[in-house]
Structures are given as structure tokens and as C-alpha cells.
């Protein structure tokens, strides 16, 4: 028997299609290093871990994916600006130390 079972997973999402999409997206997030929402996993693979998180109810489908995409885009841009600012500050400090 597969764990988590499809029956327990379908209690958390509205359809098999939604389950596949959610598990796939969450597995990609886990592969990218996003913090897990469950402390320990039975599975070593990211898809299995994503399914375990879904079963635990700690990962849900976003009701407004476009808004989430925009929010993530803004967050990425902000992180990029912060890295650039830190790089400029470091370059300025190094330049000042040389003078």
C-alpha cells in the first residue's frame, strides 16, 4: 500500500488533478531549498515529501495563483536589490580601506 494513501490525500484537496499539480509544485519548491513544513519525512524523494506535507495539511492550494506569482516576483526583485546594495556597500568599504 502506498503511503500516504490517495484517500487521505483527497481529503485535503478537491480533486486528483489538483493533487498532482499541488504535489508537483511543492516538490519543485522543496528541491529549490524551501523550508519543509513537516519536521521528519518517511520518504527520501521530494514528491513523496510533498505528498506527506499535503496529507499533514501543512501545504494547501493557493486560491489566487496569479497574486502569489506576483508576490513571489516582487520578493525575488527585492532580494536581488538587497544583494546588489550589499555588493555596492562591500565595494565601497574595500575602496575606502585602500585609500
Swiss-Prot record:
Its BP terms in the Gene Ontology are:
DNA-templated transcription
What this protein catalyses is: RNA(n) + a ribonucleoside 5'-triphosphate = RNA(n+1) + diphosphate
Could you confirm whether the keyword Transcription appears in this record? yes
One of the entry's Gene Ontology molecular-function terms is: DNA-directed RNA polymerase activity
Matching SMART domains, A to Z? RNA_pol_Rpb6
Extent of Basic and acidic residues compositional bias:
65-99
Region feature Disordered, mapped onto this chain: 55-99
GO CC terms: DNA-directed RNA polymerase complex
Q: Give the record's keywords alphabetically.
A: DNA-directed RNA polymerase, Nucleotidyltransferase, Transcription, Transferase
**Enzyme class, one word?**
transferase
Q: Does the keyword DNA damage apply?
A: no
**EC annotation from Swiss-Prot or TrEMBL:** 2.7.7.6
The domain of life is: Bacteria
**InterPro entries per record:** DNA-dir_RNA_pol_omega (IPR003716), Pol_omega/Rpo6/RPB6 (IPR006110), RPB6/omega-like_sf (IPR036161)
Q: Tell me the PANTHER family matching this sequence.
A: DNA-DIRECTED RNA POLYMERASE SUBUNIT OMEGA (PTHR34476:SF1)
Do you know which HAMAP family this protein is assigned to? RNApol_bact_RpoZ (MF_00366)
Primary role: Promotes RNA polymerase assembly. Latches the N- and C-terminal regions of the beta' subunit thereby facilitating its interaction with the beta and alpha subunits.
**Matching NCBIfam families:** rpoZ
- Subunit composition? The RNAP catalytic core consists of 2 alpha, 1 beta, 1 beta' and 1 omega subunit. When a sigma factor is associated with the core the holoenzyme is formed, which can initiate transcription.
Stated family: Belongs to the RNA polymerase subunit omega family.
Q: What's the name of the protein?
A: DNA-directed RNA polymerase subunit omega
Q: Which organism is it from?
A: Enterococcus faecalis (strain ATCC 700802 / V583)
**Taxonomic lineage from the root:** Bacteria, Bacillati, Bacillota, Bacilli, Lactobacillales
Amino acid at each position: 500500500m502506498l503511503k500516504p494513501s490517495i484517500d487521505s490525500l483527497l481529503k485535503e484537496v478537491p480533486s486528483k488533478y489538483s493533487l498532482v499539480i499541488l504535489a508537483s509544485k511543492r516538490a519543485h519548491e522543496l528541491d529549490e531549498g524551501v523550508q519543509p513544513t513537516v519536521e521528519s519525512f518517511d520518504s527520501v524523494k521530494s514528491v513523496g515529501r510533498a505528498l506527506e506535507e499535503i496529507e499533514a495539511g501543512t501545504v494547501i492550494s493557493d486560491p489566487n495563483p496569479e497574486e502569489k506569482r506576483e508576490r513571489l516576483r516582487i520578493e525575488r526583485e527585492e532580494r536581488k536589490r538587497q544583494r546588489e546594495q550589499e555588493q555596492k556597500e562591500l565595494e565601497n568599504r574595500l575602496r575606502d580601506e585602500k585609500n
